[in-house]
Amino acid sequence: MRKIFLYFIFIFFTFNNSFACQLLNVPIGSDISNASSTFEFLDDYNEEVFGKNNSARYEDYAADFCDGSDLKGTDLEVIVYQSKIAGINLINSDQENNNLIYEFAKNFIRDPGEQVKNKDWKGYVDLSVGNLVIAYTKTNVGDEIFEYLEISNIEMFDYTID
């Protein structure tokens, strides 16, 4: 009986992380009518306004969509193409906390590696899983460090590029 109880506790905590981060529960390529239950700001999307060949970008605070993460000061960018979710990006430019997205990726997706925590490290790490294209990037813009996590899929990736 004790083993069964421990098993249920383990399952609860395993699934609790992903359910607490609603932004990871929105499938790339899904219709915005489904995604708007998580991202209410998508209710304003109108494909006719953006045209058939243009993507729309919406921004909000990432922390509002991911309980249990430390994404304070991190921007969430949701990219919509032809009424479908083309990409979900996290962007952090907080110079005091420049490894927030690293911690998020490590806890919710996969560890990009300890080397990316180094303040001097700049580059890209492929964290792709299945048909999801996931990239962790750290770069300089001027004197500031920017951290990115970009999530898309093979079919929608081209529509996430400006």
Can you annotate each of these PLM segments?
Residues 4-16:
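Sec-dependent N-terminal signal peptides
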Residues 20-62, 82-162:
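Non-cytosolic coordination micro-motifs
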Residues 58-82:
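Short, compositionally biased low-complexity segments enriched in polar/charged residues
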Residues 8-9, 23, 71:
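Generic detector of short alpha-helix boundary/capping microenvironments
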